[in-house]
């Protein structure tokens, strides 16, 4: 980790070189996703539910990852919700899970070790201080070094808009882009926008769906749904980055249409899970104070909200951040060789990685001041 823990410089020549290295990583991750897409193109067509996917299937079709467990194989998924520039939370969780060690052990002897996977639910940037040069840079490093073990899903903050030759953050405030705009040309953010557009939205693992927000609107499901390939519908992908579960049983379609961020009810969730053939949905998007919450958990299915940014005195957050009230959490999903699945949340040890001895970002103050607007 430490070789990549450096602030962007305020010196134009130095930051130019730093950003060039980061954009090379952007290109590398896009190339990984393009190769995966080419190999998996069209494989969801005609598949009504996950039961129609072959055991052991692993592919990326469009913007939907599929990982169906091999019979007799164990899996261990480390899952992180929104990180929002909290680099210490990312590093802490990956180190606690010993994820990189487990990848190496699995590569050396896959018969004796569970298959380790890292699932990232999106919202890597904004709010916290270490967005593009902390969380996203490191996520790209891990994903390009272990592409068979890392799923980088898109959050609603990974959304840039171009208007009249200028790039804007799609969510306000957009601290990551606002902080760096005075120091970098627009083409840099155009390249990040290309990366964001390339990021997948969904992972289907066994009977669990991983997504940033939630399910599409009722109207889209009724009018457009064909089979699992509809998960790649552009409007469905956008809606799944923005929706939230509610305490209601059903949210009327007219109410869902009122805003980009919209609610869905318990029965709507249950119907969508049945449509997919899934039993559970794991998502981020929503700040939950306890970091991990079983929102729905009954015979119709399980919905978990996971939030991995926060910490009362986390130096990765601005002093006024509302995320200081959050206990940042991660979770482990284990699937045994016999098919039994368990979900275990764990508190992220971010404090250890606020220590300058363990996190070079905190050895000196940033040269560029974090900017909200």
Give the role of each language-model region.
Residues 1-373:
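Feature recognizes metal-dependent phosphohydrolase scaffolds
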């Amino acid at each position: 980790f430490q070789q990549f823990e450096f602030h962007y410089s305020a010196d134009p020549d130095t930051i130019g070189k730093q950003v060039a290295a980061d954009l090379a990583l952007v290109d590398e991750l896009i190339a990984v996703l393009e190769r995966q897409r080419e190999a998996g193109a069209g494989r969801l067509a005609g598949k009504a539910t996950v039961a129609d996917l072959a055991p052991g299937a692993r592919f990326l079709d469009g913007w939907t990852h599929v990982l169906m467990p091999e019979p007799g194989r164990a899996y261990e998924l480390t899952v992180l919700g929104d990180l929002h520039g909290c680099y210490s939370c990312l590093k802490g969780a990956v180190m606690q899970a010993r994820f990189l060690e487990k990848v190496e052990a699995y590569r050396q002897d896959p018969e004796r070790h569970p298959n380790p996977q890292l699932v990232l639910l999106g919202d890597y940037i904004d709010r916290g201080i270490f967005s593009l040069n902390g969380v996203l840079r490191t996520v790209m490093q891990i994903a390009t070094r272990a592409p068979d073990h890392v799923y980088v899903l898109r959050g609603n903050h990974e959304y840039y808009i171009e208007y009249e030759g200028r790039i804007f953050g799609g969510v306000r405030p957009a601290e990551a882009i606002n902080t760096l705009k005075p120091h970098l040309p627009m083409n840099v953010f155009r390249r990040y926008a290309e990366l964001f557009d390339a990021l997948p939205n969904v992972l289907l693992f066994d009977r669990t769906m991983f997504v940033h927000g939630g399910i599409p609107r009722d109207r889209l499901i009724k009018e457009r749904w064909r089979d699992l390939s509809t998960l790649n519908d552009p409007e469905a992908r956008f809606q799944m980055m923005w929706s939230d579960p509610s305490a209601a049983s059903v949210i009327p379609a007219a109410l869902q249409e009122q805003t980009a961020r919209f609610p869905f009810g318990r029965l709507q969730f249950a119907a969508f899970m049945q449509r997919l053939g899934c039993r559970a949905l794991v998502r981020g998007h929503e700040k939950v104070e306890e970091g991990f919450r079983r929102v729905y958990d009954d015979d119709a299915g399980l919905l978990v909200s996971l939030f991995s940014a926060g910490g009362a005195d986390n130096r990765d957050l601005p002093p006024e951040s509302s995320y200081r009230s959050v206990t940042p959490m991660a979770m482990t999903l284990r699937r045994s060789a016999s098919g039994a699945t368990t979900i275990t949340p764990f508190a992220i040890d971010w404090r250890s990685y606020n220590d300058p001895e363990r996190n070079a970002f905190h050895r000196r103050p940033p040269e560029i001041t974090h900017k909200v607007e």
